[in-house]
Amino acid sequence: AIIIIQQKSFLKNNKVRLSFSLRFVIYPNPSSMVAALQVVEYDRTFASAKFFFNKIKGNAIISGAFGLFRKNVVIDAGGYSSDAIGEDMELVMKLSAFCIEHGIPYKIDYIPSAICWTQAPENLRDLRSQRNRWHIGMRQNINKYRRMILNPRYGSLGSFTLPIFILFELLSPTIEVLGIISVIAGLSVGAISIMPVLILTGAYALFGIFSSLVAFAAGVQSFDMKLKIDDAVKVIG
């Protein structure tokens, strides 16, 4: 692959632009439901979350092969860690910490106009393997750079992004399982009634559908794609 970036794009307001994160799109059009669901998930993650983290200067992950880095800064910071599982997140955390601790103004960008096509896991076994790797890598990296957590010196990355990752990524499976167990236990002993549970579950489901539709619509508009009825049904489902 050949990627051409204008030299002037690496400097803006005297800040070193360390890296670019490209938007990636699943290709070809997935036939399995497992892969189709990831199309929506990727749109929600990259069209929404990365835009938001861009605004607050808190991007913590440049997705693997879909990023470009300033070579000299990467070398000065120590390069890739050979023992890192989530090497993409580890490098971004390392670069951010290095620049902040050495007083180097920097910027990490997500650029949606740069597009890279990729393939998603087509079955649950491959998806489980991928997500296990992501989860272990995130836990390893957050532990390695725990000095940044809630530390105002590291800006929004330490004060906001990392706490969000801990609450909604690392601890989310445990919280959800404990929540389900608590609801079942509460229903079984009569401590809670079924109606509030159904209302909250329905509200959560509707919010998820709405978020998916918004993300999907944004992706469709940006690519000027033609939609089929079954595509919209997959998104809602």
Which ranges hold each PLM region?
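Long helical/loop segments within the catalytic core of UDP-sugar-dependent glycosyltransferases
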Residues: 9-85, 132-139, 143
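Membrane-embedded multi-pass helical conduit in multi-pass membrane proteins
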Residues: 164-237
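Catalytic core of nucleotide-sugar-dependent glycosyltransferases
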Residues: 41-47, 125-148, 177, 181-182, ...
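A short, conserved alpha-helix in the catalytic core of glycosyltransferases
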Residues: 73-76, 84-109
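Active-site donor/metal-binding and catalytic loop motifs
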Residues: 106-126
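Catalytic core and acceptor-binding pocket of nucleotide-sugar-dependent glycosyltransferases
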Residues: 66, 87-90, 94, 163, ...
